[in-house]
Amino acid sequence: MNYPVEHYPIDRVRADFPILQQSVNGQPLAYLDSAASAQKPLAVIDRERDFYLHEYAAVHRGIHTLSARATSAMEEVRAKVATFIHAASAEDIVFVRGTTEAINLVANSYGRTAFQPGDNLVISEMEHHANIVPWQMLAQARGLTLRVLPITDDGELDMAQLPALLDERTRLVAVTQVSNVLGTVNPLAEIIRQAHACGAKVLVDGAQAVMHQAVDVQALDCDFYAFSGHKLYGPSGIGVLYGKSELLQAMPPWEGGGAMIREVSLTQGTTYADPPWRFEAGSPHVAGIIGLGAALDYVSALGVDAIQAHEGLLMRYALASLAEVPTLRLYGPVHRQGVIAFNLGRHHAFDVGSFLDQYGIAIRTGHHCAMPLMSRYGVPSMCRASLALYSCQDEIDRLVAGLHRIHRLLGE
């Protein structure tokens, strides 16, 4: 169901999240740190608990009823994920611990076979460290050149620079769909078009996008897509890597162990399972997978379009309200999604965040695992408030009031 904006059931939604009902430092909790990790609805908590109470067993390893039931439940979630991001097949979905592991899997598997010394790959200046460091490591190990697409002062990718970074030896472009600091929504269709035109593949970091907007990996025509469950109202420790079937089929395994093999012989060597199981060595986080399925059900029941409209209204309200705070500097473009980065005068982000915490307001402070982006703006850290499907206008009002109060107390 997609609710009209004026009928978005915010009170009911907030009631679904028990943690939001508490007080912090004597004040009602205003949780504005969902970009770091989102809170969990009762539907997810109850489903995971019920799985442990009544269904838990090792998957893909037993013929008994509980094992078969747990295996079936896990594979149903794989199919549910495929439907949620419009993948062609459930077998294009690999379960991992999170976005970071998904990117490392591509770097250590696809990277081992697709790159030769002298090749290059392209990332952007706004990437999370998880989409920088694995490629630096691969470049060092394989003798590659890592090229960087810069950003403009407004926090947009400088797309005019992209053609000069792409050539016949570009093997991969790795880019975020939405910046975890600036909220910039990147022009993926154009990036993918240009990359494919020179024969390069594209990996999309969807960690900050999949909870805010509909994702269609086939329409995007991306080659890899990664996201985490804990930012999508699901459990921690579970994530997803989508890969085009022909790429996954050609990739060697990264980790070895149980479940990812077809045949093991001490004399003949080992043959490997087909994807996606080839990339799922060891015992999976099956309860987390079940919880992720419940999170997808919850989001789908509300409607992604309704969530996006609700958050869009809140974002516009927040940006307009924050613009009235003296000495506050906003970072990033006007049109953004999910997050608002700012600093208050000359005050360190840590101090601002500490004061807000005393008022019951939770935000993120620091470099946000994006040190190159901090360097681009010449600051060591930023404050970041982030929105979710349970965010409300009262939380924005309290954030703005808290910042006004800090300005009065501390001055410029």
UniProtKB/Swiss-Prot annotation:
Reaction(s) this enzyme catalyzes, per UniProt: (sulfur carrier)-H + L-cysteine = (sulfur carrier)-SH + L-alanine; L-selenocysteine + AH2 = hydrogenselenide + L-alanine + A + H(+)
Protein's cellular compartments: Cytoplasm
Effect of C369S: Abolishes activity
Entries under PROSITE patterns matching the protein: AA_TRANSFER_CLASS_5
N6-(pyridoxal phosphate)lysine PTM sites in chain numbering: K231
Keywords per UniProt: Cytoplasm, Lyase, Pyridoxal phosphate, Transferase
Matches recorded under Gene3D superfamilies: Aspartate Aminotransferase, domain 1 (3.90.1150.10), Type I PLP-dependent aspartate aminotransferase-like (Major domain) (3.40.640.10)
Annotated pathway: Cofactor biosynthesis; iron-sulfur cluster biosynthesis
Enzyme Commission code: 2.8.1.7, 4.4.1.16
GO MF annotations, alphabetized: cysteine desulfurase activity; pyridoxal phosphate binding; selenocysteine lyase activity
UniProt xrefs under InterPro entries: Aminotrans_V_dom, Aminotrans_V_PyrdxlP_BS, Cys_dSase_SufS, PyrdxlP-dep_Trfase, PyrdxlP-dep_Trfase_major, PyrdxlP-dep_Trfase_small
Signal sequence segment: none
GO cellular component, as recorded: cytoplasm
Family in the record: Belongs to the class-V pyridoxal-phosphate-dependent aminotransferase family. Csd subfamily.
NCBIfam families: PRK09295.1 (NF006791), sufS (TIGR01979)
Task performed by this protein: Cysteine desulfurases mobilize the sulfur from L-cysteine to yield L-alanine, an essential step in sulfur metabolism for biosynthesis of a variety of sulfur-containing biomolecules. Component of the suf operon, which is activated and required under specific conditions such as oxidative stress and iron limitation. Acts as a potent selenocysteine lyase in vitro, that mobilizes selenium from L-selenocysteine. Selenocysteine lyase activity is however unsure in vivo.
Descriptive protein name: Cysteine desulfurase
Protein species of origin: Dickeya dadantii (strain 3937) (Erwinia chrysanthemi (strain 3937))
